[in-house]
């Protein structure tokens, strides 16, 4: 298992030097953030990114992510050209020795929270999702602004894309995902790249949009779309656990049994009323996930891929990108590494 850390490039207040000082840290999870969605990532740009990371004594473990254009998700006629571009990006990454790509198939919005700075009694702040608040939000009126979302939509564009998705139900979205997978995975497999689809976050419909990568049944359906290790998942335990109907340990075990876990996100959350939740510190006692059992499964099934501490709180007065500060994620990384060492030594 390779400990890794998300880095958002030159604009990230967390530097590669900062990350390299975290004990057990080996890899970087990053992307090229200024290439418009749907365009090819050139080998030159990939080489530049790789050289910068390696100059800091680290390696690129995973690309997170190569975004999937909305026209692909909507099944529009333009999707074939966009998929061709996606395939070329996969090939270019493979040519530079990068073999794992995380992506998602969430319509319009990436991960969704209703508050980016909920304050805990100890003064730390965290991301939370309040189901009641979410039902009162209207994305068309610009009430939503979260990291990871495409802020380039005007009000008119947002209305148009939301209207377009009104014609797309879950089965149609599955159909469009299947089309994408059957084009992408043979090409990824041929160049030794493992794709790792990220679950919907949270894993249920929001704002009337369909969401399909939501739990155990979805994973079992997904892996059957194309039978290949290259057609794998990102086991984001915090995302799956944010639906109280999901048993995250059952999901994790089954995903490992299927041999489709290509990347792991370690994040803890504390379930609230209904489908509300708060992101917490990583240790098990602070959330609803038994992180020790998750790491035991990683060891039991011989997982050798990258794992990263996912969203962290803002602590010790740190400011920056919500969920992606240095300090709490560094604590999370060392906590997970400690669990892993304990599991290994305890199994002998």
Curated annotation (Swiss-Prot):
SUPFAM superfamilies: Xylose isomerase-like
Cofactor: Fe(2+); Mn(2+)
GO-annotated biological processes: D-glucuronate catabolic process
Known pathway: Carbohydrate metabolism; pentose and glucuronate interconversion
EC number(s) stated in the UniProt entry for this protein: 4.2.1.8
Reactions that this protein is recorded to catalyse: D-mannonate = 2-dehydro-3-deoxy-D-gluconate + H2O
GO molecular function: ferrous iron binding; manganese ion binding; mannonate dehydratase activity
Keywords, alphabetical: Iron, Lyase, Manganese
InterPro entries per the UniProt record, alphabetical: Man_deHydtase, Xyl_isomerase-like_sf
PANTHER family for the chain: MANNONATE DEHYDRATASE (PTHR30387:SF2)
Function: Catalyzes the dehydration of D-mannonate.
Family stated for the protein in its record: Belongs to the mannonate dehydratase family.
Name listed for the protein in its UniProt record: Mannonate dehydratase
Taxonomic lineage from the root: Bacteria, Bacillati, Bacillota, Bacilli, Lactobacillales
